Amino acid sequence: MTDGPRPHDSDRGVYGISVAAELVGLAAPSLRLYESQGLLEPDRTPGGTRRYSINDLERLRAIAELLDAGVNLTGIAMILRLREENERLTAEGHRLRAERGEARRSRP
């Protein structure tokens, strides 16, 4: 059995702040700043240690790209919220289309 991240478990926090920072090419204090600004919310151990997931790392990479493009933290927060809302609405659209297709197939 392994304690490492499982490929399908991208929400599970497994990386400490130093490793996460190194993996995404940012400084650990930057990760703390982004958390304090509400840009991400890593898991915490019972002792309070931050644990970053694969999804957190992807989000940090997106934050870094937006910063490199000149977007400030307030703008990044707005962009990330809009992306999440877009993903939610897209998933809802797929679900509704599937339901509509199922309803059409079940008609006599």
Regions found by a protein language model. Give the residues of each.
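A general secondary-structure boundary signal
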Residues: 14-17, 24, 42, 80-82, ...
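A short, Lys/Arg-enriched interface patch at domain edges and termini
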Residues: 59-94
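Basic helix-turn-helix/winged-helix DNA-binding cores
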Residues: 1-65
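C-terminal regulatory/oligomerization modules of transcriptional regulators
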Residues: 1-7, 81-108
